[in-house]
Each structure stands twice: as C-alpha cells, then as structure tokens.
UniProtKB/Swiss-Prot annotation:
Function: E3 ubiquitin-ligase probably involved in organ size regulation.
Protein name listed in UniProt: E3 ubiquitin ligase BIG BROTHER-related
Record SUPFAM superfamilies: RING/U-box
UniProt-listed GO biological process terms: protein autoubiquitination; protein ubiquitination
Gene field: BBR
Post-translational modifications reported in the UniProt record: Auto-ubiquitinated.
PANTHER family noted in UniProt: E3 UBIQUITIN LIGASE BIG BROTHER-RELATED
EC number of the protein: 2.3.2.27
InterPro entries linked to this entry: AtBBR-like (IPR043312), BB-like_RING-H2 (IPR048217), Znf_RING (IPR001841), Znf_RING/FYVE/PHD (IPR013083)
Catalysed reaction equations from the record: S-ubiquitinyl-[E2 ubiquitin-conjugating enzyme]-L-cysteine + [acceptor protein]-L-lysine = [E2 ubiquitin-conjugating enzyme]-L-cysteine + N(6)-ubiquitinyl-[acceptor protein]-L-lysine
Originating organism: Arabidopsis thaliana (Mouse-ear cress)
Polar residues biased stretches: 34-46
Bias-annotated ranges (Acidic residues): 133-164, 173-182
C-alpha cells in the first residue's frame, strides 16, 4: 500500500529475497532503462547485506520505490527485527538460549496455571462432597437409560426398607439395653447378686462353648479310632523278615524288649564249685569269658550244665538277660539245672 513521506515522493514496500536482490544488483547496470535513468548497481554491498542479514533463507526486505517504479540508488536498507521472523537454527547462541528460556518459562507458567485451576476445582468438589464413588461413570452408555428407570422404581421403596431396618436394629438395641439395665439395677441393689449373675452368664457361655467343642472332640476321637484300626491292620500285615535294619530298630523301640532270661530262683539253684589252680578238667577255663579276668585260687565259681564256669556275679547278670551259655550257646533249662 503506498505511503506518503515528509519529503513528498511516494514510497512502496517490495518483498524480495537475498538471491533476488543480488541478481537485481548484478543486472541493474546492464538494463537499458537503468542506463538512461543513471541507476548504478552496487553488487558488493548487496551481496554483503545478503550474507550478513539472512544467509540462505528468505527475508522480507523493505525497498523504497519511487512513483516511476525504479529502485533508488544506494544500498538496500537493513531488515527490521520487528517485522522479520528468523528461524531458531539461524539465531546466535545467546539469542537461542534466550528464546529457549522464554519458551520454557511460558510452558512452566501454563502448567502452574493448569495445576492451580485443577486444585481449586478439586477443593470445590471436596467442599460440596462430590468425591462419592459413582458406578454409573464406569458403566456402558447403553445401560444408562435402564439404570435410570430402575432408580425411579427403587426410590419409592427404599425409604420403607430403610425404616424397617432402622426399627429392627432399634429393637435389638433396646433389648440389649434392657438386659444390661436389669443387671445394672441388680448391681445397684446388691453387689453379690450382680457378681452371681455375671458368673452364671459366663458359665452359660462356657457351657455352650464346651458343648460345641465336645461335638468336635467326638469327631476327633472317632477319626483317631479309625486311624488306630488301620494302623493295627498295617502292623498285622507287616512281615518282619522283609524289614530293613533301621525298620527293625524302630519296631523294637515301639514293641519293646521281651525278657528271655532265667528267674532269680533258677539262677540260685545252679551248682557252684571252688576253683583250684591247675585244674583244667571238665572244660574249666582259667579266666571268665564275660569279664576277661583270671580266676584266683579257691574262688567260688558257677558251673553251668555244659561244664563252663563263670564268676557268680557275671553269670547271674548274664542269665537274667539270656538263658544260654556265653561260650557254647547251650540253653540253661530248669530241668537241667535241677538234675545237676
């Protein structure tokens, strides 16, 4: 749009790029029109302006144009920062840092405003009690109409049901209060009666618990009896010959040991003799096999039916456990001992 200056001539703004300005400056001297009008191109100044101002990108440049339409003589005017928009990549380091800082500050300010607005809205909803969980928010939109219809029918019955529930709970509370009040009245009249009432109540509770536990105990006893029968059957079916050494030891611990020795009377009825040094007749040894000690002269020994002699104390303890001879394993029977 043409503008009027103070000097008089009208000047217009023409947008040209750096390359176009360079070409214009190079070709202005060659055009016959410029030769007639006396226009001289300044190629060096135009190229310097293009390199310093914008580089390779396009920049809007205001060029004064006279009414005749020809470009005035002289250098191109410098671009104004207010009307020019330079890309971020073409800025210097300081300008780029400043632009980035401003952008981050604007983003932070916008984020703070959004946060403050959300907190204010949350505070308002908390004051109004809008934090109640609403299941309708997560339901399907198709079921909203059906839910609304059901709510309309249910709203009429809810007050009555709530009233009945309140009455039931109130009656129960009244009964409990009456029972407690009776006990408290007794407590006010006589402490001993109050203590007895409490003791009777505890006894009734304990009896109820014991009756419940007795039923469980009976079931446990029945289960144990069944298990004992099954375990006895398992022992009856077990063959000791097929057991391992560890199983035999465990069986011995469970069953116990059976005494296979002689009675004290039978042991006392065994014959005795006096040892004579150098007397080795009838299988008499010079030492006791049980204690490994030599016999002394004129020492009393116990003589078994198999003609093996031992110290009386040693053989007595042995025969209490086992009724066989330690040397030949011959059984020491009652009849044999009586005959000898």
């Amino acid at each position: 749009m043409p503008m009027e200056n103070d000097n008089g001539p009208h000047v217009g703004n023409v947008v040209v790029t750096a390359e176009q300005a360079t070409k214009i400056n190079e070709t202005d001297g060659r055009l016959p029109e410029n030769r007639q009008t006396g226009v001289v191109s300044d190629t060096g100044s135009g190229s310097e302006r293009g390199e310093q101002g914008v580089g390779e990108s396009a920049v809007a440049v205001a060029v004064p144009v006279e009414e005749s339409g020809s470009i005035s003589v002289g250098e191109l005017p410098a671009p104004r920062s207010s009307s020019a928009r330079v890309p971020f990549t073409n800025l210097s380091q300081i300008d780029a840092d400043l632009a980035l800082a401003r952008t981050l500050q604007e983003q932070e300010r916008a984020y703070m405003m959004l946060t403050m607005n959300s907190e204010i809205s949350d505070y308002g909803s908390w004051e109004t009690g809008s934090y109640v969980y609403d299941e309708d928010e997560f339901d399907d939109p198709e079921n909203e109409d059906e839910d609304d219809d059901e709510d309309e029918y249910e709203t009429d019955d809810d007050p009555q049901e709530d009233g009945l529930d309140v009455n039931v709970h109130a009656n129960e509370d009244d009964q409990e209060d009456d029972g407690n009040s009776d006990i408290e009245e007794v407590a006010y009249t006589d402490d001993e009666a109050y203590a007895r009432a409490l003791q009777e109540a505890e006894e009734r509770d304990m009896a109820a618990r014991l009756s419940a536990l007795s039923g469980l105990a009976n079931r446990v006893v029945e289960d144990l009896e069944d298990e004992s029968h099954t375990s006895q059957d398992a022992w009856d079916e077990m063959d000791p010959d097929e057991l391992s050494y560890e199983e035999l030891l465990a069986l011995g611990d469970i069953v116990g040991t059976e005494s296979r020795g002689l009675s004290a009377d039978t042991i006392a009825s065994l014959p005795s003799k006096r040892y004579k040094e150098g007397d080795n007749q009838n299988g008499t040894n010079e030492s006791c096999v049980i204690c490994r000690l030599d016999y002394e002269d004129d020492e009393d020994l116990i003589l078994l039916p198999c003609k093996h002699s031992y110290h009386s104390e040693c053989i007595n303890n042995w025969l209490k456990i086992n009724k066989v001879c330690p040397v030949c394993s011959a059984e020491v029977s009652t009849s044999t001992s009586g005959q000898s």
